[in-house]
Amino acid sequence: MYLVGEALIGEGAELAHIDLLLGSKEGPVGSAFANAVSQLSMGHTPLLAVVRPNLLTKPATVIIPKVTLKDMEQVNEMFGPVQAAVAKAIADSLEEGAFKDIDIEGIAIIASAFVHPEAKDYNRIYRYNYGATKLALHRALDKFPDEKTLVYEKDRAAHGIMGFKVQRLWDPPYLQVAMDLVDMGKVAQVLKEVPQNDHVIIEAGTPLIKKFGLNVIGEIRKLRPNAFIIADMKILDTGNLEARMAADATADAVVVSGLAPTSTIEKAISEARKVGIYSIIDMLNVQNPAKLIEKLKVKPDIVELHRAIDTEETAHAWGDIPAMKKAAGGKLLVATAGGIRVEVVKDALKAGADILVVGRSITASKDIGHATDEFLDQLNREEIDQFRIMTDF
């Protein structure tokens, strides 16, 4: 058995990223340690962690460069501040009692270290790698993260280097702005004026996709890179193919019509799950949504109770939302759509809605920002992590 730890600390070109393995010298970590020291690789030469020349840290630690070292400047950074930082972090942890009840002569540590080719500041390189090594080591010893922490954090996480956040819908209720538009100028205006908010979803409506194709998702993404974007394709056939097309276009969710054959719906849901996007069933003109959900072998992420624009003057009737959630096994978001106005938001939420789909009340407003804020005020939901102080993650 061996333990695994990881940590990223710092900023700019000098940031440090350490992947760490700790295990018995008699096991796979010990074998990998011996192979690393005895089988050198050009540009990725492993080096033992020493506090200073002739002073090996304990437990014995080998450092593996993650990035090919192409010039002497990078070599000096790896054999200088990185080597010293890793060794000192391990030695300090030993002094602090991190290895209590562990035979330090019986274990080995492998630390993979990242040095950006543009890194220059030795002081920052040292301090960031020291912190990252120490944090990675303690995470390994603590078996961090536990399952509860991982599940809690996974959908609110933003990768430090990726540059954008993949939104997930774990904190309802949400406001979905439906852009059933055919003018890209108007689309740009809406995207510019709708406030940035964790509880806003952007929908590329069916007319918009029919006119401009799925490429419109990419255009929306350019203006709102962190938005949760729905491709309202109302799939009726080739469910798996069209769901994959939506994912390839960078949509976060795809809509399949509840009037489609059951096999088409199931294929769309399965494909959406496979590629990591949400599946939505539009229940427009479906007489018994709960019954449809119940008979599906794979359940959708979201059900949209959608009254068509042509019939939205009729009374607000969203059906038995609790029955639909029960049919889906309890883990289902329900969206209500069609003529949603500010004065009926509370009724929809009380009925069990998780997502309020609003179109013309926002997109046709003379003050799009203010109109959106009115709906958001009704949701009574603060920004995710607004008051959270971020440290390690």
From Swiss-Prot:
Enzyme Commission numbers on file: 4.2.1.147, 4.1.2.43
Catalytic activities: 5,6,7,8-tetrahydromethanopterin + formaldehyde = 5,10-methylenetetrahydromethanopterin + H2O; D-ribulose 5-phosphate + formaldehyde = D-arabino-hex-3-ulose 6-phosphate
Active-site residues per Swiss-Prot or TrEMBL entry: 17 (proton donor)
GO BP, one annotated term: carbohydrate biosynthetic process
Family matches, as SMART domains: OMPdecase (SM00934)
This protein's pathway: Carbohydrate biosynthesis; D-ribose 5-phosphate biosynthesis
Protein name: Bifunctional enzyme Fae/Hps
Class of enzymatic activity (EC top level): lyase
Binding site for substrate: 19, 48, 66, 68, 83
Segments of this protein annotated with the region 3-hexulose-6-phosphate synthase: 162-393
GO-annotated molecular function: 3-dehydro-L-gulonate-6-phosphate decarboxylase activity; carbon-nitrogen lyase activity; hexulose-6-phosphate synthase activity; hydro-lyase activity; orotidine-5'-phosphate decarboxylase activity
Pfam families reported for this sequence: Fae, OMPdecase
Family the entry assigns: In the N-terminal section; belongs to the formaldehyde-activating enzyme family.
Gene3D superfamilies named in the record: Aldolase class I, Formaldehyde-activating enzyme
Top-level taxonomy: Archaea, Methanobacteriati, Methanobacteriota, Stenosarchaea group, Methanomicrobia
Function: Catalyzes the condensation of formaldehyde with tetrahydromethanopterin (H(4)MPT) to 5,10-methylenetetrahydromethanopterin.
Entry keywords, A to Z: Carbohydrate metabolism, Lyase, Multifunctional enzyme
Organism: Methanoregula boonei (strain DSM 21154 / JCM 14090 / 6A8)
Region Formaldehyde-activating enzyme: start-end pairs: 1-161
Disulfide bonds: none
